[in-house]
Design a protein with these regions (language model features):
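Short, intrinsically disordered, charge-balanced linker/junction segments flanking boundaries
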Residues: 2-5, 61-63, 231-232
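Acidic/His/Gly-enriched intrinsically disordered linker/tail segments
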Residues: 223-232
């Protein structure tokens, strides 16, 4: 089931502490590597994801946790809330010994916010700036689009060995570690670039995730809209 190519369900072992980390990357047609589905952008469905993982792991998916249960063998069962109707390519599971920090955005509803990184990288997370940029994006897009954030929570996860800059999984946005986390002093341009990427992926929640093209030949609509919106 695991891959080492960054497609489907990718497995990474951190050389710093031997902790194991998993993440999914399904765009364009790799959800079928992990579960049986009609893996097309127009064939949307509701999803109710559950996992069994080591007891010390964190698991992040598109929606919040609905139920948990401790199991024998130092494992645990996690059931996530059922999703809205979404495309297969924006479903996601991220799991491992992640550390996290949390906040919330207040609008007509409360949106839980999370930032996750592997244990050996977490000390570099600039949560204050990332949360500030995230909240600014929500405020601007909700007002500009005239539509409240259409999903539940909003987590942003830095993952290792990532082929992309970032991916707009519903409520579970994955980023290349070097895009989201700065391990040394950087220029103002780097902060602007990170903010642009955060807002690009956030714009996809409305255009790409909520409203989705019928087939991959029109993926440029998703990307051009998100790129335009990220500079607004």
């Amino acid at each position: 089931v695991y891959s080492n190519s960054g497609e489907g369900l990718h497995r990474f072992v951190d050389p710093a502490d031997d902790e194991v980390y998993l993440y999914t990357q399904f765009e364009t047609g790799d959800a079928r590597r992990m579960y049986a589905c009609f893996d097309q952008p127009d064939q949307k469905a509701t999803f109710k994801i559950s996992t069994i993982v080591p007891a010390h792991w964190e698991v992040i998916s598109n929606y919040g946790v609905d139920a948990t249960k401790d199991l024998d063998g130092d494992k645990k069962f996690i059931q996530f809330a059922e999703s809205q109707v979404i495309a297969t390519y924006v479903t996601a599971i991220v799991a491992g010994a992640y550390q996290s920090v949390h906040d919330e955005y207040q609008c007509d509803k409360t949106i839980p916010l999370g930032i996750y990184a592997r244990k050996s990288f977490f000390k570099y997370v600039d949560a204050e700036n990332i949360f500030e940029v995230t909240k600014q994006g929500f405020a601007y897009f909700e007002e500009t689009f005239g539509l409240a954030y259409p999903f539940g929570k909003y987590d942003q996860i830095a993952v290792a060995e990532y082929n992309w800059g970032a991916m707009e999984n519903v409520g579970c946005v994955t980023f290349h570690e070097d895009v989201l986390i700065f391990r040394s002093k950087v220029t103002e341009r780097s902060y602007i670039s990170r903010a642009t990427t955060i807002h690009h992926e956030m714009a996809h929640m409305w255009f790409g995730d909520l409203v989705t093209m019928k087939w991959w030949q029109d993926l440029w609509l998703n990307e051009s809209f998100a790129e335009w919106a990220s500079y607004m």
